[in-house]
A protein has these predicted regions:
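Fe-S-dependent hydro-lyases/dehydratases of central metabolism
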Residues: 1-166
């Protein structure tokens, strides 16, 4: 629903030249549905950069604002330095506010655009798990070779946690 609203706001418009709009779909399924519904093309045509569905923005990787710069974020990761810039001004906002602000170049209230239309969600959401690798059967686990470069170390062996934490 959020991506439908964002596409509605951006349709036929161009992101402000002083703004870098990056969109990170939450999963490969969301990205596929955005493509199927024409949303992806609308976002790209408006000037949005589409990021890989992976741990990126929420771990502070990529799209770091300049020192003292402002960044609007629509995901729930917000603490000092999380954006990758220790003195960045990071604001948590709705996708609608982020999209409209990307057009204007400043913090803008999307209600200025008027009422949003009623969006109809698909009856069925696509699920495509073809890239998920399931664990080997237990009887074959000893045969699985984990390939590591010289800078990747295995997890340290630790004792099980106690039943309670004091």
């Amino acid at each position: 629903l959020d991506m439908m609203k964002v596409a509605h706001i951006l349709k036929g418009k161009t992101v402000n030249p002083d703004v870098s709009l990056a969109i990170a779909p939450g999963s490969k399924q969301v990205l596929n549905m955005m493509a199927d519904m024409g949303i992806l093309g609308t976002l790209i045509a408006a000037g949005a950069r589409i990021l890989e569905s992976a741990c990126g923005p929420c771990i502070g990787m990529g799209q770091s604002p300049n020192s003292g710069g402002i960044s609007l974020r629509t995901f729930n990761r917000n603490f000092l330095g999380r954006s990758g810039t220790k003195d960045g001004q990071i604001y948590l906002v709705s996708p609608e506010l982020a999209a409209y602000s990307a057009l204007t170049g400043y913090l803008s209230d999307p209600r200025e655009l008027g009422e949003m239309p009623d969006f109809v969600l698909p009856e069925k959401f696509s699920v495509n798990d073809n890239m998920i690798v399931l664990p080997a059967p237990e009887e074959e686990m000893d045969k699985v070779e984990i390939l590591r470069g010289p800078n990747i170390k295995p997890f340290p062996e630790t004792a099980p946690l106690e039943a309670t934490i004091k």
